[in-house]
């Protein structure tokens, strides 16, 4: 009788242990599945984009709004190539627009689709040009926060340089900065809607050395070349 009771107890203990193991296995499988799903979500590549630079520019314009989008002058290919120094054989297509009075309104939108391996070079060239724009507004402070908030994006073979949005009229620098931030948020959202991921701004603001842009421009009243100015 004692042996029978001992056998029953042992059987019950084994069954309980097996049930616990089964439950743990199920929990581990669930956790593994959840982890795998989360990893897959994180590693999902951005959705393929087939838009042309002109179509992307139209999305940016729509995000800003007709009233505040004042890039109304096309930069022709010859001027575009000579001013910026791009190798045009490496650019599949592009759109380049600015305001007709560039000396006062710095608004500029450049969208390019380049060939493989040229995107970073294009970014570097645009940053060199941006350094000049920053130097200019430090000498002649028009739309300072709009310029300092400029966007320079690179996604695959697409490169974009954007100074755009509503212009602040007043002398409150804090309010000017708030307006610029709000306008560029619209541009960031438009870019994210196109490419499926938050953009990373590659624009580099040069250090202010107190000499109007680090010696980029003379300190006198000499004319400063500005496209469209």
Describe these PLM feature segments.
Residues 1-4, 8-9:
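Positively charged n-region of N-terminal signal peptides that target proteins for export
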Residues 13, 23-24:
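N-terminal targeting and processing segments of secreted/endomembrane and organelle-targeted proteins
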Residues 16-20:
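C-terminal motif of bacterial Sec signal peptides marking the signal peptidase cleavage site
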Residues 24-229:
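Mature, Sec-exported extracytoplasmic domains of Gram-positive
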């Amino acid at each position: 009788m004692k042996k029978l009771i001992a056998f029953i107890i042992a059987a019950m203990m084994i069954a309980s242990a097996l049930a616990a193991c089964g439950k743990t296995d199920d929990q581990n499988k669930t956790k593994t599945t959840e982890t795998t799903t989360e990893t897959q979500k994180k590693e999902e590549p951005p959705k393929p984009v087939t838009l042309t630079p002109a179509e992307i520019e139209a999305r940016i314009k729509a995000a800003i709004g007709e009233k505040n989008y004042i890039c109304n002058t096309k930069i022709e290919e010859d001027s575009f190539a000579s001013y910026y120094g791009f190798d045009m054989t490496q650019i599949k297509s592009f759109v380049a627009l600015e305001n007709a009075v560039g000396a006062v309104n710095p608004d500029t939108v450049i969208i390019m689709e380049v060939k493989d391996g040229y995107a970073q070079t294009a970014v570097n060239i645009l940053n060199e040009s941006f350094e000049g724009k920053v130097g200019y507004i430090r000498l002649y402070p028009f739309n300072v926060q709009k310029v300092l908030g400029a966007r320079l994006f690179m996604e695959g073979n697409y490169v974009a340089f954007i100074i755009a949005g509503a212009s602040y009229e007043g002398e409150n620098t804090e309010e000017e900065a708030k307006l610029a931030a709000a306008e560029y948020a619209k541009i960031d959202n438009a870019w994210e809607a196109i490419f499926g991921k938050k953009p990373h701004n590659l624009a580099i603001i040069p250090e202010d050395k107190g000499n109007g842009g680090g010696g980029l421009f003379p300190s006198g009243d000499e004319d400063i070349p500005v496209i469209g100015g």
